Curated annotation (Swiss-Prot):
Protein name: Succinate--CoA ligase [ADP-forming] subunit beta
Known EC number: 6.2.1.5
GO terms for biological process, alphabetical: succinyl-CoA metabolic process; tricarboxylic acid cycle
Domain of life assignment: Archaea
Pfam families attached to this UniProt entry: ATP-grasp_2, Ligase_CoA
Enzyme class: ligase
UniProt: Mg(2+) binding residues: 191, 205
InterPro entries xref list: ATP-grasp (IPR011761), ATP-grasp_succ-CoA_synth-type (IPR013650), ATP_grasp_subdomain_1 (IPR013815), Succ-CoA_synthase_bsu_CS (IPR017866), SUCC_ACL_C (IPR005811), Succ_CoA_ligase-like_bsu (IPR005809), Succinyl-CoA_synth-like (IPR016102)
Subunit structure: Heterotetramer of two alpha and two beta subunits.
Family assignment from sequence similarity: Belongs to the succinate/malate CoA ligase beta subunit family.
Entries under PANTHER family matching the protein: SUCCINATE--COA LIGASE [GDP-FORMING] SUBUNIT BETA, MITOCHONDRIAL, SUCCINYL-COA SYNTHETASE BETA CHAIN
Binding site for ATP: 45, 52-54, 91, 94, 99
Length: 381
């Protein structure tokens, strides 16, 4: 579960991490009331779960009331990488002289949490990791012993952080690790940490992702879950128990098993398409769940074509086929072309059940993906 920036900053502030004064607004009038209280300059920030908000026009700095009104009007309701902005954070501007990145995530290769610090703050850290990996200092933490204070100081100094603010940055990093551990987070970061001319250290942004399977241990975070969903599709996925991630492409993808869905995503990209989503219906999916999955994908206006990839183990091909037929029979006109590939348990029975007037059937995954990509291209031409 991804927390919004304002939610994560509330948690950070409660833990003692310095954050700018801010107010949440859902209307232009609320935004103007907020800047009247906070003063100028003020950052007007879209609250959506996407990276690169600034480059996409989702963050603006207002220096007076007219600009604040203009930017609030522009950002509220805008489409930001497929998400509609319905709330903004109005935040006190920070006069900074330097920017850093600090974060904690799980290194799955090592099976341990890893602290990360870089003086390349304020930019996409994934790009830094790819283009200049040495610019990120790392320190693994043995979960059996926890974080030792010297480890935070060590990784901060190794990153080349100025000595006069290094201890303050190490303190923020230590607190982030504590929050990471206490809240069953999968990722927590600040990008950027801003250093002011007075050498104050301020968390100007906040990212905090929580393991949804651990929410039963955190009722306070569970209460944030409803607000953290960006749209009805994510909300539906949570209700249905699907693993769902919305992407920016136009080829809808449904499968059973995370690995199978990821393989399908890779093939869509390989054959020149753009995946619109990751949707795993899980093992043993009955017709009802398949119907719900198709309904979800059809509801995404960005989807132009759908590929359904099922390998039967626990999931029976005949049940999946029934679900596909039931879902498609609900429509007077099929809204998107659907390509189906079935293999494994009861796959032959499933292929016979499928109504080929409603779907296109392919025997191999490669053929199914190529047809779906072609179908999507035909819609956009």
């Amino acid at each position: 579960m991804k927390l919004h920036e304002h939610q994560a900053k509330t948690i950070f502030a409660d833990a003692g991490i310095p954050v700018p004064d801010s107010r949440l607004a859902t209307t232009v009038d609320e935004a103007l009331d907020a800047v009247d209280e906070i003063g100028y300059p003020a950052a007007i920030k879209a609250q959506v779960h996407v990276g690169g908000r600034g480059k996409a026009g989702g963050i603006k700095i207002a220096t007076d009331r007219d600009e604040a009104e203009q930017y609030a009007e522009e950002i509220l309701g805008m489409d930001l990488k497929g998400y509609t902005v319905d709330q903004i954070l109005v935040e006190q501007g920070v006069d900074f002289v330097d920017e850093l990145y600090v974060g904690v995530t799980m290194d799955r290769g090592e099976g341990q949490p890893v602290l990360m610090v870089s003086t390349e703050g304020g930019v996409n850290i994934e790009e830094v990791a790819e283009e200049n990996p040495d610019a990120i200092a790392r320190e693994h933490v043995d979960p059996a012993f926890g974080l030792h204070p010297y480890q935070a100081r060590k990784v901060v100094y190794e990153a080349g952080v100025d000595a006069d603010v290094a201890l303050d940055v190490a303190s923020i990093l230590t607190t982030l690790y504590d929050l990471y551990e206490e809240n069953d987070a999968s990722e927590i970061e600040v990008n950027p940490v801003m250093i002011t001319s007075d050498r104050d250290v301020i968390a100007a942004d906040a990212v905090m992702n929580i393991d949804e399977d651990a929410l039963f241990r955190h009722p306070d975070l569970a209460e944030m879950a409803e607000e953290s969903y960006e749209d009805d599709l994510e909300r539906k996925a949570g209700e249905y128990g699907f693993d769902y991630v919305r992407l920016s492409g136009n080829v809808g993808i449904i499968g059973n098993g995370a690995g199978l869905v990821m393989t399908t995503l890779d093939l869509v990209d390989y054959y020149g398409g753009k995946p619109a989503n990751f949707l795993d219906i899980g093992g043993g999916a009955k017709a009802e769940r398949v119907t719900k999955a198709l309904d979800m994908v059809f509801s995404d206006e960005n989807v132009d074509a759908v590929v359904f990839n099922i390998f039967g183990g626990i999931t029976r091909g005949d049940e999946v086929a029934k679900g596909i037929n039931e879902a498609l029979e609900q429509f007077d006109e099929i809204p998107k072309k659907v390509v189906v590939r079935l293999a494994g348990t009861n796959a032959e029975e499933g292929m016979e059940i499928l109504n080929t007037d409603l779907v296109e059937v392919e025997e191999t995954l490669e053929d199914a993906v190529q047809r779906a990509v072609k179908n999507a291209e035909e819609v956009t031409q």
